[in-house]
């Protein structure tokens, strides 16, 4: 490899120097907090001998002792040392694991409602048991949140053994669970589940009709694993329960066709697009893409072309907003969204690729029509638009908890955001063993081709000496390109991206074997440790698969749930034997890997977020193991292009730097770090902006869900309905009979408004417009209110009280849900439109808040009005239906009575009588006469046909149906 240029250059920007001075003067926040926490940790450690000396029954009984202390007025902080010490001893007896001092510190931080930053391999799963056990003693419920079902199930079974041993119950929330199972799981002291499932359960709970259908029981305390992924990366992605919406229009295809005719200009520098309108016009530029801001905007030239293409005069007119929206989404689909980076096309569907993990996000869709625009771009079926039934962001869901905490290996870079949005401090927990990973400076190349050549050279060199290598890429496309290059060099390797994710855990687990080479996108195994020398657990499972064990049994072999199933017990025995065997075998290999330098992490591009880069680095140097990390960059990388890559490339060309000659300089790394900080600040600003808008809807959601709960919990609505009647009539009278001159009154419209609900029967209700003209508006209002209440009172007397109360409840909930769904859509449209307006000095968020609450008030009025209408009309209709049903039942009873009274059914004219039918059979036959005629598959009628037994009945004979009439006047009249 060529000698690096400027290799001795060291540069520290003023900002970095300033921060270092601040740290020197005031000390590091985490270090100060750790000093405060250490005495609590010491108390826990001091109790070790006390609880170790206890018998099984004595230790188990400590849960009851601690609960009693809480009942007597002590707080969880008071009992923390004892609770942690009990849990620690229990873990040793049940799991064979004892919390290290640093893990106790991590547990204390979590209990205090903070974020514990703990490096990879430091045992976060075990750490969570300490605060979970302590807070589980309160009986209010603890939620331990993971990013997927696999981790939730694994941790609940594994750590559940400890909780059950100590007398606490555990629950598990996974996608396949039914409502009854969910309710039981939430009733447990400690519940494991994914962020998606918990959020969706909350939304579904606020759509139920009966409180017994709710599954959650409150939000007391949550411990969020991989907290940065859930609260930062997914903060902008709302949880949405959707229903079938309108059919997608052909505008998506038309807008896509238009977008393909346009000429685009891409900007990579913020300062390079000033005063560019003349340039756009001269070069026929139709739309501009700002890759840094991720926006696509039509130029004046593009606007004119759109008006010509769609045959409209002014694209910005309000009546053309729909066309404008579709065009904007089409140019965004073509200009911003990239195939195999932002999304993939699989089996005729567009599937989102998570920007932070590289995983496919099945079931998720881009909102505001962007997904349909991409479908049009890729030529796949454009799916129907959906209607939002309920929605919430993770930001607002997790802020429901009285106490929130989290764990991650990378949180410091987002410490400000955690504090500002969630009021969560980040405390860095020291590792149990010193980190031995060496982080080498970045190498920057002139071209991507030169960079990849050096990456492959590094991989080959490391592979030949037995050092395992994990190569991180930021897209599927790049991972596959590197894979082709390695194949040409004859290097055996594994590729892990969203297209080949089925064996993710196994590939990641074996990435630490001697000479292993793994190429992975950002998804590379959070939740699965890379162990030097190989992972004995996965080797044991592979061996069991060869022996013929089913996948189900192999899964159960590492489970911790209690069972007496012989097959499962045998599988566990086999696994334990194989696991022990492979652990011994890999010891020698692990030592060789350590001698080779440990795991070598190669980053092929910097991510927008330093945190994602740190996660990749953190795969190496686990639990004091050696390791190396290095990033290989080029001036053509996306991040470099956006922040001066072109200028850097020009400098390198002037210096005649070859494509494969790297520049290793602290200056470059600092420039990149600074660029990442700028992007992080921008993304924080975007998330903050999203939250400001969502807070408006969230406040409205709290009001609606709170009042909904009052209805569910059995609040008597009689007085509420009376108040609704008064408010509804007051609003309508003010609308049609406004203050001021009477010529502005519209009595006819007022009468039309009340038609069919207040004025149900004009003969009964004397609504004489001439008489009303002489009355005051206030008197008219009072008269209408009095009459409405009279109708309501009459309705109450028609049906049982419990029926009326149930109708009030169900109709009110139905109207709340229907109007809330429409309101969510209206708020979305308001948000989209408000950003297009120019308010001068006005803040768009303030305008959104004002208009949003005006719309909310209108929604409340609509709920009130529809509920009043239903309660004045429906009880009478229900009563009439009930009366009709009673009349039908009475007729049936009469028919049965007549049949029973008949002393003779069939006369056989002296012949032997056939067996007589019972009176009930006869009555049923009579009832069948009234049944409708159906048509069979061949078009023939399948109506009931008279089947006679014995001799034909004469026309003047008594009718055999038992009516007492002659046959010709009864059943035989049509013959």
For every predicted segment, state its role:
Residues 51, 343-351, 357-364, 594, ...:
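Extended, charged helical/alpha-beta scaffold domains that provide interaction surfaces
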Residues 2, 6-13, 18-656, 705-706, ...:
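Conserved P-loop NTPase motor core
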Residues 93, 329-338, 585-587, 734, ...:
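Flexible, glycine/threonine-enriched loop-and-boundary segments that flank and lead into catalytic domains
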């Amino acid at each position: 490899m060529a000698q690096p240029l400027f290799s001795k250059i060291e540069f520290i920007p003023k900002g970095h120097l300033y921060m270092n001075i601040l740290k020197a003067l005031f000390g590091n926040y985490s270090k100060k907090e750790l000093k405060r926490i250490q005495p609590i940790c010491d108390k826990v450690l001091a109790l070790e001998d006390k609880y170790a000396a206890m018998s099984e029954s004595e230790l188990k009984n400590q849960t009851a002792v601690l609960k009693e202390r809480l009942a007597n007025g002590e707080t969880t902080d008071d009992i923390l040392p004892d609770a942690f010490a009990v849990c620690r001893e229990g873990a040793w007896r049940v799991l064979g694991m004892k919390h290290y001092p640093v893990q106790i510190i991590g547990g204390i931080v979590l209990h205090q409602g903070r974020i514990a930053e703990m490096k990879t391999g430091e045992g976060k799963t075990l750490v969570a048991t300490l605060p979970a056990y302590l807070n589980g003693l309160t009986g209010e419920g603890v939620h331990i949140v993971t990013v997927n079902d696999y981790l939730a199930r694994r941790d609940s079974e594994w750590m559940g053994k400890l909780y059950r041993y100590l007398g606490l119950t555990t629950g598990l929330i996974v996608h396949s669970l039914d409502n009854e199972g969910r309710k039981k799981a939430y009733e447990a002291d400690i519940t494991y589940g994914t962020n998606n499932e918990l959020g969706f359960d909350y939304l579904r709970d606020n759509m139920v009709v009966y409180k017994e259908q709710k599954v959650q029981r409150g939000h007391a305390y949550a411990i969020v694993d991989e907290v940065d992924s859930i609260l930062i990366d997914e903060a902008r992605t709302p949880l949405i329960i959707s229903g079938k919406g309108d059919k997608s229009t052909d505008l998506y295809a038309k807008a896509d066709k238009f977008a393909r005719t346009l000429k685009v200009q891409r900007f990579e520098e913020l300062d390079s697009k000033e005063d560019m309108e003349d340039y756009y016009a001269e070069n026929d530029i139709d739309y501009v893409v700002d890759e840094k801001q991720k926006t696509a905007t039509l130029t004046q030239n593009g606007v004119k072309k759109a008006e010509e293409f769609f045959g409209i005069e002014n694209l910005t007119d309000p009546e053309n907003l729909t066309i404008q929206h579709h065009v904007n989404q089409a140019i965004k689909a073509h200009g911003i969204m990239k195939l195999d980076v932002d999304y993939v096309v699989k089996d005729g569907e567009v599937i989102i690729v998570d920007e932070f993990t590289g995983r496919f996000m099945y079931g998720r869709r881009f909102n505001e029509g962007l997904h349909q625009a991409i479908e049009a771009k890729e030529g796949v079926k454009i799916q129907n638009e959906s209607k939002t039934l309920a929605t919430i962001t993770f930001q607002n869901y997790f802020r429901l908890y009285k106490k929130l905490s989290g764990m991650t290996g990378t949180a410091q870079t987002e410490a400000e955001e955690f504090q500002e949005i969630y009021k969560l401090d980040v405390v860095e927990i020291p590792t149990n063993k010193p980190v031995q990973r060496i982080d080498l400076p970045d190498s920057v190349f002139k071209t991507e081709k030169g960079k990849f050549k050096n990456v492959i050279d590094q991989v080959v060199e490391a592979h030949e000496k037995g050092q395992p290598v994990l190569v991180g890429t930021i897209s599927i496309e790049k991972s596959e390109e590197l894979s082709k290059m390695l194949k040409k060099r004859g290097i055996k390797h594994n590729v892990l991206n969203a297209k080949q994710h089925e064996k993710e855990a196994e590939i990641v687990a074996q990435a630490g074997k001697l000479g292993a080479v793994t190429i992975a996108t950002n998804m590379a195994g959070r939740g699965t440790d890379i162990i030097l020398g190989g992972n004995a657990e996965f080797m044991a499972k592979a061996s069991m698969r060869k022996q013929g064990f089913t996948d189900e049994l192999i899964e159960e072999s590492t489970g911790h749930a209690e069972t007496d199933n012989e097959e499962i017990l045998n599988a566990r025995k086999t696994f334990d034997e194989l696991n022990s065997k492979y652990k011994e075998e890999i010891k020698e290999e692990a030592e060789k890997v350590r001698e080779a330098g440990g795991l070598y992490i190669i980053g092929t591009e910097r991510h927008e977020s330093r945190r994602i880069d740190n996660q990749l680095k953190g795969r190496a140097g686990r639990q004091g193991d050696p390791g190396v990390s290095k990033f290989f960059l080029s001036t053509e990388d996306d991040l470099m292009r956006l922040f001066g890559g072109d200028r850097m490339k020009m400098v390198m060309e002037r210096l005649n730097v070859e494509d494969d000659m790297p520049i290793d300089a602290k200056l470059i790394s600092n420039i990149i770090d600074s660029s990442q900080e700028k992007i992080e600040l921008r993304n924080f600003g975007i998330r903050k902006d999203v939250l400001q808008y969502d807070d408006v809807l969230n406040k409205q959601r709290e009001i609606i869900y709170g009042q909904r709960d009052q209805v569910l919990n059995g609040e008597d609505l009689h007085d509420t309905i009376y108040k609704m009647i008064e408010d509804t009539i007051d609003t309508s009278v003010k609308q049609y009979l406004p203050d001021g001159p009477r010529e502005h009154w519209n009595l006819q419209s007022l009468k039309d408004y009340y038609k069919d609900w207040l004025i149900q029967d004009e003969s009964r209700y004397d609504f004489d417009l001439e008489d009303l003209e002489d009355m005051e508006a206030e008197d008219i209002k009072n008269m209408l209110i009095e009459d409405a209440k009279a109708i309501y009172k009459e309705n109450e007397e028609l049906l049982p009280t419990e029926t009326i109360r149930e109708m009030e409840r169900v109709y009110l909930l139905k109207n709340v849900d229907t109007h809330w769904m429409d309101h969510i859509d209206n708020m979305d449209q308001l948000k989209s439109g408000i950003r297009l307006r120019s308010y001068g000095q006005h803040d768009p968020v303030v305008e959104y808040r004002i208009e949003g609450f005006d719309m909310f008030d209108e929604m409340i009025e609509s709920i009130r009005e529809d509920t009043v209408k239903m309660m004045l009309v429906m009880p009478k209709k229900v009563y009439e239906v009930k009366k009709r049903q009673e009349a039908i039942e009475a007729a049936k009873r009469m028919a049965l009575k007549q049949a029973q009274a008949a002393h003779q059914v069939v006369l056989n004219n002296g012949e032997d009588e056939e067996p007589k039918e019972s009176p009930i059979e006869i009555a049923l036959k009579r009832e069948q006469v009234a049944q409708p005629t159906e048509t069979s598959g061949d078009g023939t009628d399948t109506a009931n046909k008279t089947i006679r037994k014995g001799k034909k009945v004469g026309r003047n004979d008594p009718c055999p149906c038992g009516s007492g009439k002659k046959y010709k006047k009864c059943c035989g009249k049509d013959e």
